[in-house]
Amino acid sequence: MHDLYEQGDTLASIFEAAAAAGTADHVVQFASTSKITHAGAGVAFLAASAKVLDALDKHLGVFSIGPDKVNQLRHVKFLNGRLSAHMADHAAIIRPKFELVEEIFSRELNGLGIATWTKPKGGYFVSLDVLPGLASRVIAMAKAVGLTLTPAGATFPKGDDPDDKNIRIAPTFGSLDEIHAAMDILTLCIKTASAEQVLGAR
């Protein structure tokens, strides 16, 4: 659904895997339209086995009379029959931003052996790995010159990246000019921190 290109990734079904393993009651999947319509005003939903849904229904019924049915209707009327076209419009806005990140990373970092990164076909993030022990340093260097990045370890449980190497890049919000400047700063910080580490080890 959140594809950047017409041919997105095909994701495996966790429910099919759980059912095949006899653990269907162990999976509860949450989703919302927050990145489809409007953050904070979307429709949330969950999927689970009938047994789990029955148990959740008993608990949730105590907390609320019911969901916001007007908002549900608003979403049905807006998205009915045009969800794919709506998401293609999203992709047209953010795809150039991801392509710019890829262009700058490839130009500035490719072949240096100091960073690797994903080239996603969908979603909202690029996962960047720098040399072990440098993510926090790179983020601090960037912040010192005015670029605020997602904290190191944000993609790990409890925010703890044992290798201190992963940085999550979220290029959807800024303009192309802002992203260009940010990636120029980031790649320079990566090169500088990497050089410091290599020279310090000699």
What positions do the PLM features span?
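Conserved glycine-rich beta-strand-loop-beta hairpin in the small C-terminal domain of fold type I
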Residues: 91-102, 114-129
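Conserved core segment of the aminotransferase class I/II
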Residues: 19-95
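Short beta-strand segments
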Residues: 31, 45-47, 119, 125-129, ...
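PLP-dependent enzyme catalytic core of the Aspartate aminotransferase-like
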Residues: 23, 144, 160-202
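Short, solvent-exposed loop/turn segments at secondary-structure junctions
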Residues: 1-3, 34-37, 50-53, 71, ...
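Conserved C-terminal alpha-helix-loop-beta "cap" of PLP-dependent enzymes
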Residues: 57, 128-168, 176, 180-181
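Conserved PLP phosphate-binding loop immediately N-terminal to the Schiff-base lysine helix
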Residues: 1-15
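Short, conserved active-site loop motifs that form the nucleotide-linked donor/cofactor pocket
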Residues: 27, 115, 147
